[in-house]
Amino acid sequence: MAAAAGRSAWLAAWGGRLRRGLAAGRRAVPTRGPLAAAVAGVALAGAGAAWHHGRVKAAAREGSRTVSAQKNYLGPIEKLSLRKQRFMQFSSLEHDGEYYMTPRDFLFSVMFEQVERKTLVKKLAKKDIEDVLSGIQTARCGSTFFRDLGDKGVISYTEYLFLLTILTKPHSGFHVAFKMLDVDGNEMIERKEFVKLQKIISKQDGFKTVKTNETEYQDPTVKEPGVNTTLQVRFFGKRGEKKLHYKEFRRFMENLQTEVQEMEFLQFSKGLNFMRKEDFAEWLLFFTNTENKDIYWRNVREKLSVGESISLDEFKSFCHFTTHLEDFAIAMQMFSLAHRPVRLAEFKRAVKVATGQELSDNLLDTVFKIFDLDGDECLSHGEFLGVLKNRMHRGLWVSQQQSVQEYWKCVKKESIKGVKEAWRQQAGKGPF
């Protein structure tokens, strides 16, 4: 605990300020509450955009070889998908013409919409990448994995898409795809099968361009990186000789979701172990540009009482709910078809049906007060869903995306292709 607190204080002094309101120089005080395990995240969040801005001088002191951040890969920006643009903006490593993120870059990319910075991208030789990845196998594989690694990791674009999908989709679909590629039936896959799983999941997640909303041609054919990456070393070892069991992969998904949730909670709670309801509203509306945004903020000012707060556990339960938005939307269709408003009890029941869990009355009351556009104590659920999708996709959601049924149908189709290929490679001639 003392070591974590010391590291937090050092990072806070180095980072300077949090983009969304963390005061410069604020110290993180470790507590015995539920945020104790995540205390290092306060300082990492506090570093925020300021860290990226200071990266140039730090890199120069390290004597790293760098190239200008005027990345000519951006070219005609409108031809890149929203996710590709975000990846390019936050990536800080380059090897053999390919760009990569560090674990820190990834966390910042899901916390912040953009970074105002003039930065230099570090060019790495293959030996440099091996050095960067050297500590991954000994890192603690819990809910502080990415924070503990910091810059000691390499994340490819395919892995970036895969990690984003973990944050926005329920686990059930991953299990189906995992079992489809498990030709031995022991819920274990090898490295080459995991690469297929990444491409299958990432390929289907609606890679839309900014202006045309057409599927980007480059994304579905992203090639496998020519070097080891963070996830590959974490799951399969440096030489790729290990196998990955689904239970371990599920723990990784749960830990990743927990880590990002803790980081965002600390970001908007200003490092405290509770979040004011106004802070929760700010988190909800962070990536939202709806025309009713002013009405939502008026509701926050007029309907939410000063001093009321949201706990970390309540925040996590709400984030769990947001990974089941497609199922929740189906439950809401009965109200849309009947032209009926959604009242609190009906909303609560729909959440239970979609997720198997309940949201606290405190959370439900907060959501209803914010999204009651007409003052009739009913939820404007259509726009509420749009706001939540933008929130969970970190501003990268395109409304024309396919439904969850279409998504997993595509996943199943691609998984079958992967199974056929796996059988051919394993037996020379498969039963297909």
From Swiss-Prot:
Record: residues binding Ca(2+) 1: 182, 184, 186, 188, 190, 193
Residue interval of the organelle targeting sequence: 1-22
Summary of the tissues where the protein is detected: Predominantly expressed in stomach, intestine, skeletal muscle, kidney, heart, testis, prostate and uterus.
Residues annotated as domain EF-hand: 169-204, 224-259, 290-325, 359-394
Effect of inactivating the gene: Mice display diastolic dysfunction, characterized by left atrial enlargement and delayed sarcomere relaxation and cytosolic calcium reuptake kinetics in cardiomyocytes. A significant proportion of mice die from abdominal aortic rupture.
InterPro entries for the chain: EF-hand-dom_pair (IPR011992), EF_hand_dom (IPR002048), MICU1/2/3 (IPR039800)
Molecular functions (GO terms): calcium channel regulator activity; calcium ion binding; calcium ion sensor activity; protein heterodimerization activity
Chain positions recorded as Ca(2+) 2 binding sites: 372, 374, 376, 378, 383
SUPFAM superfamilies: EF-hand
Residue ranges crossing the lipid bilayer per the database entry: none
Residue numbers of Phosphoserine PTMs: 202
Biological role stated in the UniProt entry: Calcium sensor of the mitochondrial calcium uniporter (MCU) channel, which senses calcium level via its EF-hand domains. MICU1 and MICU2 form a disulfide-linked heterodimer that stimulates and inhibits MCU activity, depending on the concentration of calcium. At low calcium levels, MICU1 occludes the pore of the MCU channel, preventing mitochondrial calcium uptake.
Subunit structure: Heterodimer; disulfide-linked; heterodimerizes with MICU1. Component of the uniplex complex, composed of MCU, EMRE/SMDT1, MICU1 and MICU2 in a 4:4:1:1 stoichiometry.
Family: Belongs to the MICU1 family. MICU2 subfamily.
Record's protein name: Calcium uptake protein 2, mitochondrial
Native species: Mus musculus
